[in-house]
């Protein structure tokens, strides 16, 4: 929920509006239209778009803001479009997976760009010197990863499979989902029928979807052991729909194939000749089309050279690490999970062995470390590097940015700076940092540290429309030593 202490909409351009009418002047990071009442109170309006004149029904009031739902549009935005999905909207039971289908895709990107710039300035007091061209891709059928909730409803004797309703714990009664790949969208109703036919229909709370370039995997979470008959039904479904079934009886570590064999899950990064095998519960980007462009753009901005050492922080399976290894002299991938580090090494070794153009990947090593507890001592222990790629989760890279800032503050003799660690004399900070973010607020916080305390400039920033029709803002920023 947005807060007017953090977000202040532009003033309305219309005056003397009829009673109850509101002029929407902005959209917040939750995809709500924002207006002001004549008394100055901010109103967040579900379903309203900038430039529209609307009426709305208030359902929550605070001292200086209200939350409301759109009831009527008196002047429509030129960017309003017909939603592509019948389950999108403000009606009872509407799906909560998307928030912006009523807004033209190009305008969605513009809203996300403004959200990024507003966060950088208001939270970090940072303004990028250059705005990068947005990274865009298909608006529909892009979501190759999804966690679908499952529920058997005894009163209706049917199974629901899909996302939750808007602002609700209930599962939407979905027959279709246009952001899923077409072949998965076509499976929704058959999946409902399959689960409904199983003895375990009321003990299967979730199906996780993971699509590779050629393989589609479905992970069935089941709270009780499956009967042989239920397993046979899964096999029959797999044969008809061309999917792999994985089973999850308990935690993520228990995930296993229903039947061994078959082609492994993998996605390619063809610009670098890299193939990335993965398991269905691994973190991979939701949108493979955008991921390919994102990796190429990030590496172009990083501009690693054959005489340079690069560190990839929060490296995961090596989505950026391995492409960097096609360009740099040496690469170090750092990740918080020992299991992911082991998998990264395997991916590196398999790609090294399968290089078809005769080139070799750079010397690359992987280490596990708690990246949320980084210190200046740990930075220096990892050795000097020319450039960094940083791709943290939503929590951001505060400890990493703070450690870099602490070293800089100590070197310039700032008051209250921590002492310099032993061995710092030969250590130099990276000349360039490319930061890929899935949360503009934590990016802005970290950018503030890098720019105001660590001696960097924010030379470029821009959005990546990884999740069309949602309010999620993916972005990237480039920092260079001042």
UniProtKB/Swiss-Prot annotation:
Reactions catalysed, as given in the entry: uridine(1939) in 23S rRNA + S-adenosyl-L-methionine = 5-methyluridine(1939) in 23S rRNA + S-adenosyl-L-homocysteine + H(+)
Q: Which GO terms describe its molecular function?
A: 4 iron, 4 sulfur cluster binding; iron ion binding; RNA binding; rRNA (uridine-C5-)-methyltransferase activity
Question: Where [4Fe-4S] cluster is bound, by residue?
Answer: 85, 95, 98, 177
InterPro entries, sorted: 23S_rRNA_MeTrfase_RlmD, MeTrfase_TrmA_CS, NA-bd_OB-fold, SAM-dependent_MTases_sf, U5_MeTrfase_fam
**What residues form the catalytic site here?**
438
Top enzyme class, one word, equals: transferase
Q: Which residues bind S-adenosyl-L-methionine?
A: 285, 314, 319, 335, 370, 391
State its Enzyme Commission number(s).
Answer: 2.1.1.190
GO BP annotations listed: rRNA base methylation
Return the Gene3D superfamilies for the record: 2.40.50.1070, Nucleic acid-binding proteins, Vaccinia Virus protein VP39
Which keywords, in A-to-Z order, does the entry hold?
4Fe-4S, Iron, Iron-sulfur, Metal-binding, Methyltransferase, rRNA processing, S-adenosyl-L-methionine, Transferase
Q: Where are the transmembrane segments?
A: none
The disulfides recorded in the entry are none
- 4Fe-4S: present as a keyword of the record? yes
Among NCBIfam families, the record links this protein to: PRK13168.1 (NF009639), rumA (TIGR00479)
Family stated for the protein in its record:
Belongs to the class I-like SAM-binding methyltransferase superfamily. RNA M5U methyltransferase family. RlmD subfamily.
Q: Per its database record, what is this protein's job?
A: Catalyzes the formation of 5-methyl-uridine at position 1939 (m5U1939) in 23S rRNA.
Protein name as catalogued: 23S rRNA (uracil(1939)-C(5))-methyltransferase RlmD
Origin organism of this chain? Acidovorax sp. (strain JS42)
Organism phylogeny: Bacteria, Pseudomonadati, Pseudomonadota, Betaproteobacteria, Burkholderiales
């Amino acid at each position: 929920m947005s807060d007017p202490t953090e977000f202040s909409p532009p003033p309305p351009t219309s005056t003397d509006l009829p009673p109850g009418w509101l002029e929407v002047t902005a959209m917040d990071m939750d995809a709500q239209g924002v207006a002001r009442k004549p008394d100055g109170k901010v109103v967040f309006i579900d379903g309203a778009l900038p430039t529209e004149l609307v009426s709305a029904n208030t359902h929550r009031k605070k001292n200086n803001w209200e939350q409301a739902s759109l009831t009527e549009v008196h002047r429509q935005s030129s960017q309003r479009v017909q939603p592509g999905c019948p389950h999108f909207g403000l009606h009872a039971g509407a799906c909560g997976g998307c928030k912006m289908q009523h807004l033209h895709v190009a305008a969605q990107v513009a809203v996300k760009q403004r959200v990024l710039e507003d966060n950088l300035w208001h939270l970090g007091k940072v303004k990028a010197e250059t705005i990068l061209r947005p990274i865009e891709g298909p608006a529909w059928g892009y979501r190759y990863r999804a966690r679908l909730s499952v529920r058997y409803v005894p009163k209706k004797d049917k199974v629901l499979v899909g996302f939750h309703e808007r602002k609700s714990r209930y599962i939407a009664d979905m027959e279709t989902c246009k952001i899923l790949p077409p072949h998965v969208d076509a499976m929704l109703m058959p999946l409902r029928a399959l689960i409904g036919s199983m003895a375990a229909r009321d003990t299967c709370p979730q199906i996780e979807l993971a699509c590779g370039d050629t393989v589609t995997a479905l992970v069935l979470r089941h709270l009780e052991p499956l009967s042989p008959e239920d397993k046979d039904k899964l096999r029959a479904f797999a044969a008809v729909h061309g999917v792999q079934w994985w089973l999850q009886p308990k935690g993520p570590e228990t995930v296993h194939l229903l039947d061994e064999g078959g082609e492994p899950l993998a996605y390619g990064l063809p610009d670098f000749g890299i193939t990335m095998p993965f398991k269905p519960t691994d973190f991979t980007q939701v949108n493979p089309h955008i991921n390919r462009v994102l990796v190429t753009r990030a590496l172009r901005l990083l501009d690693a050279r054959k005489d340079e050492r690069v560190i990839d922080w929060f490296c995961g399976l090596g989505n950026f690490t391995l492409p960097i290894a096609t360009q740099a002299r040496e690469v170090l991938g750092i990740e918080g999970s020992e299991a992911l580090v082991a998998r990264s090494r395997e991916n590196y070794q398999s790609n090294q062995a399968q290089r078809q153009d005769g080139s070799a990947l750079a010397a690359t090593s992987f280490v596990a470390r708690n990246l949320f507890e980084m210190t200046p001592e740990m930075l220096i222990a990892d050795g000097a590097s020319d450039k960094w790629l940083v791709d943290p989760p939503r929590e951001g890279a505060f400890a990493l940015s703070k450690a870099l800032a602490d070293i800089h503050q100590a070197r310039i003799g700032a008051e209250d700076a921590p002492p310099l660690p032993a061995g710092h004399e030969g250590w130099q900070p990276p000349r360039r940092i490319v930061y890929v973010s899935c949360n503009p607020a934590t990016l802005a916080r970290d950018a503030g540290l890098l720019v105001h305390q660590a001696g960097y400039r924010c030379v470029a920033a821009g959005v990546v429309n990884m999740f069309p029709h949602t309010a999620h803002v993916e972005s990237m920023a480039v920092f260079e030593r001042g």
